[in-house]
Amino acid sequence: MDRLFDLAQRAAQLEQAWRSKRLARVGDTSLKLARMDAQAYPDEAHACAEGLLVLDGELHLDVAGVAVTVTAGQLYMVPAGVSHAVRPGSHGTLLVIDA
């Protein structure tokens, strides 16, 4: 099991934007890495809360009809059951924290 993760290197190896790769589990929680591109991503909601940590770049969200921008170093927590979508223009690397 890996214990040290070079997130920039791992993100560069991701073949497809918005297709996350699970790096590890901590209890019931998954840590997943995703590469963002400028394309929008469809609306979704989850049974559990989801953390979106922007490692570099910007994430542009629509959360229940409200525009939210998350920049590098910021963590946005999407509450369980809340509808959210990625707006066009997002870019960079995202760490997704979910159950």
What do the predicted segments below correspond to?
Residues 30-46:
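Conserved short histidine dyad/triad with adjacent acidic residue
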Residues 80-99:
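Ligand-binding loop in jelly-roll beta-barrel domains
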Residues 27, 55-56, 71-72, 90:
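A cytosolic small-molecule/anion-sensing beta-strand core signal
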Residues 38, 47-60, 64-65:
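Glycine- and acidic-residue-biased ligand/ion/polar-headgroup-sensing regions
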Residues 65-80:
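Short acidic-glycine-tyrosine-enriched beta hairpin
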Residues 29, 37, 66, 82, ...:
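A generic "binding-loop/recognition-motif" signal
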Residues 1-33:
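A short, N-terminal "cap"/entry segment at the start of jelly-roll beta-barrel domains
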